[in-house]
């Protein structure tokens, strides 16, 4: 079934073309509205003329309704403003060129890339917008390229406090000073326990006793000296050190007479 150009323009008063990546709308102004012969329409026309009066008016109404049904619907979104001049694309002579655009002439890769690049390009700072400062740019670059230290690397070594202070600020040096003060405190406590052991009633050849036993023995020895100041006969009936062997962690030999021996050695 062949369709002539006049019938095609009558059926489709608006055509669309796609050339060089651009959609264009063509409005066919010189359309020849010729009714399409239809057996059903002819039968209805004969029936109306024979049976119903005023057939001329009804026939015109039917023809207009049929023509409205045959015209394709146009969306309201494609409204062409009348204020701007209408630029009509040249109408091709062949119907095939209207229905099937030349695909070989359409750029496949160039056109979408240009559109995407135009969308992705950031806006350049104008005179009204403030330019980013150099300090902010340096901060962002330092955060982006932060140095990562692998703790499991074989070449990893403990840095010196001076190096830590240079890299991470003065906070690392304060931590190092705090650790140094803690070590000094532990050293002083150990020296105090050593001086306290020298005053206890234990021989110097005795093995070193623990800190807990040192404190327990010091408490009992202070009680013994207090009772001895009250009564000189307390040393003959002293029970201050009873049960110390059961509480102590090791077998410690206690001799009250060794106090004079320790004091004489300290005086020497």
Swiss-Prot record:
Coiled coil location: none
Region of interest called Disordered, as start-end residue ranges on this chain: 117-140
Sorted UniProt keywords: Activator, DNA-binding, Nucleus, Transcription, Transcription regulation
Biased composition (Low complexity): 117-130
Residues in bHLH domain copies: 173-225
InterPro entries recorded: bHLH_dom, E-box_TF_Regulators, HLH_DNA-bd_sf
UniProt keyword Amino-acid biosynthesis present: no
Function of the molecule: Transcription factor that regulates the development of the g2 pharyngeal gland cells and pharyngeal gland function and thereby is required for feeding. Required for the expression of a number of genes in the pharyngeal gland, possibly by binding to the E box motif (5'-CANNTG-3') in the promoter region of these genes. Positively regulates the expression of genes encoding mucin-like proteins, which lubricate the pharyngeal tract to ensure efficient passage of the bacterial food source. Exhibits pharyngeal gland-specific positive autoregulation activity.
Protein name from the UniProt record: Helix-loop-helix protein 6
Species of provenance: Caenorhabditis elegans
Organism phylogeny: Eukaryota, Metazoa, Ecdysozoa, Nematoda, Chromadorea
Gene: hlh-6
């Amino acid at each position: 079934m062949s369709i002539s150009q006049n019938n095609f323009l009558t059926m489709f008063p608006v055509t669309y073309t796609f050339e060089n990546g651009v959609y264009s709308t063509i409005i066919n102004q010189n359309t020849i509205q010729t009714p399409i012969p239809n057996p059903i329409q002819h039968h209805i026309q004969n029936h109306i003329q024979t049976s119903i009066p005023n057939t001329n008016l009804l026939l015109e109404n039917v023809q207009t309704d049929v023509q409205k049904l045959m015209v394709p619907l146009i969306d309201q979104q494609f409204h062409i403003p009348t204020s701007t001049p209408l630029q009509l694309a040249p109408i091709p002579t062949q119907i095939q060129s209207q229905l099937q655009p030349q695909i070989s002439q359409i750029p496949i890769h160039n056109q979408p890339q240009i559109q995407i690049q135009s969308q992705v390009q950031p806006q350049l700072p104008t005179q009204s917008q403030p330019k980013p400062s150099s300090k902010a740019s340096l901060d962002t670059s330092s955060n982006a390229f932060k140095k990562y230290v692998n703790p499991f690397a074989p070449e990893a070594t403990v840095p010196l406090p001076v190096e830590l202070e240079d890299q991470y600020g003065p906070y690392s040096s304060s931590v190092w000073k705090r650790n140094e003060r803690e070590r000094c405190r532990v050293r002083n406590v150990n020296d105090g326990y050593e001086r306290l052991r020298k005053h206890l009633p234990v021989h110097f050849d005795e093995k070193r006793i623990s800190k807990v036993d040192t404190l327990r023995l010091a408490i009992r020895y202070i009680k013994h000296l207090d009772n001895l100041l009250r009564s000189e006969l307390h040393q003959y009936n002293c029970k201050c050190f009873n049960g110390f062997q059961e509480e102590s962690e090791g077998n410690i030999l206690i001799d009250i007479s060794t106090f004079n021996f320790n004091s004489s050695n300290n005086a020497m």
